[in-house]
């Protein structure tokens, strides 16, 4: 069996989905997305979409996730320390346009993503 190595100029990277990493599901003007209404499931417990968010009865994984919203600087530093050169992320629409009916975007949401992009450029 031969060993395969990556070339020295190989670009390592990471990717995340906003609803799986950000948390802060109701912070700074963000309103719930369908992912925020999706409950935790298990092998014997199917996930549910609840019309009303009921935190007394269900756990919602997207509500905290890995809390990238509050820890993106540390997370980006960890990725840089690991030598990652690429980062793909999605943007949560309900952080920018909370209900989808706004004529102007949510400034706090825009600022959050701008801050991430500035941190990535360091």
Regions found by a protein language model. Give the residues of each.
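Non-catalytic accessory regions flanking glycosidase/transglycosidase catalytic cores in CAZymes
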Residues: 1-122
């Amino acid at each position: 069996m031969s060993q395969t190595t990556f070339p020295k100029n190989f670009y390592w990277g990471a990717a995340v989905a906003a609803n799986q990493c950000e948390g802060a599901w109701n912070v700074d003007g963000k309103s719930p997305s369908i992912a925020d209404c999706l409950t935790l499931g298990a092998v014997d417990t199917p996930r549910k979409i609840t019309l009303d968010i009921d935190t007394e009865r269900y756990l919602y994984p997207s509500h905290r996730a890995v809390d990238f919203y509050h820890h993106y600087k540390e997370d980006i530093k960890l990725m840089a320390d690991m030598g990652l050169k690429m980062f793909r992320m999605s943007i949560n629409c309900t952080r920018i346009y909370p209900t989808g009916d706004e004529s102007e975007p949510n400034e706090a949401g825009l600022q959050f993503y701008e801050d991430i992009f500035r941190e990535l450029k360091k």
